Amino acid sequence: MLGGLAYRFGYLSRRFVQHNSFHFSTTDKALAFGAYPFLPSLGLEETNPGCYHSGKWMAGSESLLSYNPHNNSPTASVNLATNDHYEQCIRAMESERDRWMLTPAPVRGEIVRLIGEELRKHKGELGSLISLEMGKIKVEGDGEVQEFIDTCDLACGLSRTMEGKIIPSERPGHFMLEQWNPLGLIGIITAFNFPCAPLGWNAAIALVCGDLMMWKGAPSTPLTSIAVTKIISRVLDRHGFSSVFTLC
């Protein structure tokens, strides 16, 4: 994000809350995926790759299960990323870094606004997924998605107000100009108890400011991370910026 705005808007999560109840794929229980008809509408399947960059979904051989904390039944499995996938994500972001940074801020703001519009279309399904995977009530799941939407609206407005200063110079015929510059590649880590909203607080602002980001969601809420990434990536892909946002 822009250097001077980093402190003001907190573009990185300050803490990582470790949640130790996630399970690797070792269970005799059948997956309950079919019991939740809203999952396919979010692009989810019984088995899902857990790493994304450059318009591609990838995964290694190790996997974990997403559980419904209400009854401890497995919902779906997610194949995890490898160290090599992580390096691929970094290289992909580096390859698109200059082009995204040099894109005018109002253009980036319009893309973020469209991300908010896409989230609006799927607010109900995402709220249900958050409720299913994390265990909070449905209205709070919807509220998390609304927080993301509201931050997209805020960020879109900010994209036209990030002005600098023109400072008088002691040299005749000269002046000094203050210009904000993006930080570059950043990481966003979110905890299990708020698997969606904190991403929005950080990612919407960082995108407008010209940063590229890698998201590390909580291991106990992987389906939420995948579903939200699918929504964000659809908008970015349509505008030719498939490597600005990665999930690993």
Enumerate the predicted regions with their spans:
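Rossmann-like NAD(P) dinucleotide-binding subdomain of oxidoreductase/dehydrogenase enzymes
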Residues: 164-248
